[in-house]
Amino acid sequence: MTDVIRAEGISKSFGPVAALTDISLHVGRGEILGLIGDNGAGKSTLIKILTGYHQPDGGRLLFEGEPVTLKSVVHARSLGIETVFQDLAMVDDLPVYLNLHLNRELTHRPLPFLRRGEMKRRAREALDSIGISIPSVTTEVGMLSGGQRQAIAVARSVYSNAKLLLLDEPLAAMGAKESAVILRLLQELKQRGDIAIILIAHNYGQVVDVCDRVNLVQHGEITFDRASADTSVAELLELVNAEYRLGGGQ
């Protein structure tokens, strides 16, 4: 399996506070890596480094086997690194097809008129290609369920030819039915075999079920890296709780 992204010995500090210490991870095409850990463990900082928002103080990144310095979020996106956050960054009163093309609108150059017909067609094709069921691409996003909205956010990244997709708590505040929509979508993307996925989640059952491997981040370090088939929710909970007890519950 070819690694899409590989981090080697990544460190990051903010003033006297060490956010990451000697972090190494990798994820390849057709693979889902689960990233777990308590709030403040360093997951968000790591994601921001992988998406060009922060630059590391030490270590290096390799993208598709080549050393890379991600200078900005825009630079990372130009390489095919896309992120879906919990807040989605979508416009509720715009229809699905315009949200899917947000900041990527098709126009009749040199005139600034939108090619709405083609945008609708491409939006429908993008949704159908990964099995997302939406009654109409002209429906306003604000009228959809949380699971449908999150699915559209994922589809937007895939439509942008993502090679690495990072999902930051995509299932937070979702019910079981809506979560199932996203978990099925992730499995569909995995089966395509052309996208590497990093999933940050607090539901360890979902992580074990959908991910190929699990990394546990504690105090800015990866302390656990194992295939999901070789671990369990009980083991992950014990690792986190043991660290919590050793820390005196702080």
Describe each model-derived feature in a short phrase.
Residues 2-250:
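Glycine-rich phosphate-binding loops of nucleotide-dependent enzymes
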